[in-house]
Curated annotation (Swiss-Prot):
Coiled coil: none annotated. It comes from Shewanella oneidensis (strain ATCC 700550 / JCM 31522 / CIP 106686 / LMG 19005 / NCIMB 14063 / MR-1). GO terms for biological process: regulation of DNA-templated transcription. Keywords: Cytoplasm, DNA-binding, Transcription, Transcription regulation. This is Probable transcriptional regulatory protein SO_2432.
Amino acid sequence: MAGHSKWANIKHRKAAQDAKRGKLFTKFIRELTVSAREGGSDPDSNPRLRIAIDKALGGNMTRDTIERAIKRGAGELEGQQLETIIYEGYGPGGTAVMVETMTDNRNRTVSGVRNAFSKSGGNLGTDGSVAYLFTKRGVLSYAPGTDEDALMDAALEAGAEDVVSYDDGAIDVFTEPTAFYEVKDALDAAGFVSDNAEIAMIASTKAELDAETAEKFMRLIDTLEEHDDVQEVYHNAEISDEIMESLG
């Protein structure tokens, strides 16, 4: 979003909605379970699991609950079998949207995702239809007031790819996925604690939306995120701070 950290408005809005709907713990447990199943139960050798653990702890999930989810994923406890499926589509204003889901029922999930796109005036695409517009990168976000020069020096020395500052003082540090925790640990040790840290799909091009289109687009995002099987939604929409504020 213009002059503002790409993640700030929609991420904060999303987190508030997730908490309000009581969905955060469900999402944490699913991510912990699938991460452990696909990459093993040791977070030191499974970066995806380590990120999931950090997010769960940040959301006040108990270590006991986290451990049970990991054991379930590793096959030490019984539980539902989930698989990760990525859906791609086009939203209002020609926006590119990627929807990461975890499900035990493909038919239920694809039906819900397709319906969300259709209701917003968009359409669900085929595999690869928008994926080429996104690159997987690590993102570390820092609040306004952070010493930009010191953070940039520390980040680049630690192996970050890029450091982007915004008009309001917010800063994003971008990394290769494989270097994410090396950079994060170095910055943590240097006293730079991020507001948000994740490996995400970053769009290479943006679609700027006017107020009317932005309202339709956010309705699509809300509908997708209300679906129990949806874990993350990535997109290339560019929405100004003023429009985001008007949307609430």
